[in-house]
């Protein structure tokens, strides 16, 4: 699973050939979550501040993430 970014202890991953809908995986300490790129639905648990930071990162990189998803 390729790591696509790391910040504030949050590690973001994008699996190749993963199931739809487009999403990324992230870890923060013992927390493991998936978050959809388009509608930001979260699967898993993490502190609200961490989810907010991941959402801001996705906002800044949404087009690039969707392009990577299509190529994967």
Kindly label every feature range from the protein language model:
Residues 3-7, 26:
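Short acidic-hydrophobic surface loop/beta-edge motif
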Residues 14-46:
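A short, structured beta-strand/loop element
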